[in-house]
């Protein structure tokens, strides 16, 4: 299971390398969608069925609409792929070489260390009350996001709206 998670993580980073090498918008959108699916599978691997499904439906659904619209507005007759130009190919190869170097370094030094500790999340923890029952952590986490992070949700929604508006204005040419 650890190797599957490791391969999924490598696939996620390689997807980001493929996107950051600035291919045509069609290929960039495809790579982001595939990376999003891999990220959702990683969440499912950690036992977050509810959160993985929500991320898949909301994030990927919105992304497919936005990228479908922008690629329709900015369609190219000959789209630039990763092997089309020397610059794009070199950037992909450098990114993949850095990922292979990181994988070998982690393998050599026997893992990674924990950098972030979550010490002050006591109010988000689930405590068992009287009686017996099954409580899943995923919906409780979504409830905590909307309860404690309500302003973060508002700012995120506004940012997504402004981002879509900017992309539409740029694609339209005004």
UniProtKB/Swiss-Prot annotation:
GO molecular function list: NADH dehydrogenase (ubiquinone) activity
Predominant localisation class: mitochondrion
Main enzyme class: translocase
GO cellular component: mitochondrial inner membrane; mitochondrion; respiratory chain complex I
Subunit text: Core subunit of respiratory chain NADH dehydrogenase (Complex I) which is composed of 45 different subunits.
Signal peptide start-end: none
Transmembrane segments: 1-21, 26-46, 47-67, 86-106, 111-131, 151-171
Lipid bilayer topology: Multi-pass membrane protein
Entry's localization field: Mitochondrion inner membrane
BP term (GO), one: mitochondrial electron transport, NADH to ubiquinone
EC number(s) from the headed UniProt entry: 7.1.1.2
Family: Belongs to the complex I subunit 6 family.
Job of this protein: Core subunit of the mitochondrial membrane respiratory chain NADH dehydrogenase (Complex I) which catalyzes electron transfer from NADH through the respiratory chain, using ubiquinone as an electron acceptor. Essential for the catalytic activity and assembly of complex I.
Protein name in UniProt: NADH-ubiquinone oxidoreductase chain 6
Consequence of substituting residue 72 to V: In LDYT; most severe mutation with no vision recovery
A Pfam family matched in the record: Oxidored_q3
Taxonomic placement: Eukaryota, Metazoa, Chordata, Craniata, Vertebrata
Annotated gene: MT-ND6
Catalytic activity: a ubiquinone + NADH + 5 H(+)(in) = a ubiquinol + NAD(+) + 4 H(+)(out)
Regions annotated as coiled coil: none
Organism this protein belongs to: Homo sapiens
